[in-house]
């Protein structure tokens, strides 16, 4: 018998799989919905500073295999990071054999001059 769990007990790839199931009209334990599936868009996080290792590359590939529709990055302020991230994403899509998902580049605009100075001192790029 299935036991309900908190959403926080699901990691990203499992949650993407659950959303795909809901979109097909099947609940978390395999029961069909009476009125068809949902139309959720599946998104996942992507940290451009953590894309250098093989483990993170494989995690990105698993997200792509799970059918992610878009990726949202952590804040990025350095163009070479964005370009490198695009190259890694392209390679991952080729590895998995999937279309490239939309990429939403995260930004945190500084609201004050003091915050801008802090960003300049503390944030790479």
Label the predicted regions.
Residues 6-38, 43-50, 93-125:
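Active-site pocket-lining/capping segments in soluble small-molecule metabolic enzymes
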Residues 63, 67, 105:
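Conserved, mostly hydrophobic/aromatic
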Residues 12-20, 60, 79-86, 90:
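Generic structural signal for well-ordered alpha-helices
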Residues 50-52, 77-81:
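Acidic-and-aromatic substrate-binding clefts and catalytic sites of carbohydrate-active enzymes
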Residues 52-64:
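Short, acidic/polar
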Residues 66-71, 96-99:
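Glycine-rich loops and low-complexity Gly/Arg-rich segments
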Residues 2-7, 54:
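Short, solvent-exposed loop/turn segments at secondary-structure boundaries
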Residues 1, 69-79:
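Catalytic beta/alpha-barrel core
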